[in-house]
UniProtKB/Swiss-Prot annotation:
PROSITE patterns assigned to the protein according to its UniProt record, in alphabetical order: CLP_PROTEASE_SER
GO MF annotation: an example: ATPase binding
InterPro entries in UniProt: ClpP, ClpP/crotonase-like_dom_sf, ClpP/TepA, ClpP_Ser_AS
Job of this protein: Cleaves peptides in various proteins in a process that requires ATP hydrolysis. Has a chymotrypsin-like activity. Plays a major role in the degradation of misfolded proteins.
Organism, as annotated: Dehalococcoides mccartyi (strain ATCC BAA-2266 / KCTC 15142 / 195) (Dehalococcoides ethenogenes (strain 195))
Name of the molecule in the record: ATP-dependent Clp protease proteolytic subunit
One of the record's GO cellular component terms: endopeptidase Clp complex
Top-level taxonomy: Bacteria, Bacillati, Chloroflexota, Dehalococcoidia, Dehalococcoidales
Gene3D superfamilies the record matches: 2-enoyl-CoA Hydratase, Chain A, domain 1 (3.90.226.10)
């Protein structure tokens, strides 16, 4: 039996040369839209990075839209995506649909200034870096030092992109910290709430 999460919608596109079937993500990529809709891990990061690099090569002057609906995930994978977003020439607009949590919040706020958005009912969430370790005491100590190093990196990124002082970032991310879209604007995580334009 086919699992619903493994079903990818197909879209038929007609042209003078005939019909062609695209999976929905390929069609979005043609429009310079990337969708991050899962937990962040190495495989997901590799796919997003490949798409960013492809769109950079295709047209370095045209914006890219990164839609985010993610609970976060592996810090190293998220930082690989973050560094690529900062490296490529096109401006990356970020849009939170649903939820951006943890590492996904870092990616959301790292979009191009003035082009970071959330939908009206989106939830943005920050917290401390998390990790686990087992084994000898010295191994656990090494793992703890590494998670603290990564946490410092994430906090510095949040300071850079939100304009908030480090003390506030440390205080607010010490435990689970939830924001609605308006609070995220006030915090500096996003620039604007996307609304449907009113009909005139």
């Amino acid at each position: 039996m086919i699992s619903p999460e493994n079903v990818v919608p197909m879209v038929i596109e007609s042209s003078a040369r005939g019909e062609r079937a695209f999976d929905i993500y390929s069609l979005l990529l043609k429009e310079r839209i990337i969708f991050l809709g899962s937990q962040i891990n190495d495989q997901v990061a590799n796919l997003v990075i490949a798409q960013l690099l492809f769109l950079d090569r295709e047209d370095p002057d045209k914006d890219i839209s990164l839609y985010i609906h993610s609970p976060g995930g592996v810090i190293s994978a998220g930082l690989a995506m973050y560094d690529t977003m900062q490296l490529i020439r096109p401006k990356v607009s970020t849009i939170c649909v649903g939820v951006a949590a943890s590492m996904a919040t870092v990616l959301l706020c790292a979009g191009a200034k003035g082009k970071r958005y959330a939908l009206p009912n989106a939830t943005i969430h920050m917290h401390q870096a998390m990790g686990g370790a087992q084994g000898q005491a010295s191994d656990i100590e090494i793992a703890a030092r590494e998670i603290m190093r990564q946490q410092d990196i994430l906090r510095n990124i949040l300071v850079k992109h939100t304009g908030q002082p480090m003390e506030k970032i440390i205080h607010d991310s010490d435990r689970d910290y939830y924001l609605n879209a308006q609070q995220a604007v006030e915090y500096g995580l996003i620039d604007e709430i996307l609304q449907k334009p009113e009909n005139k």
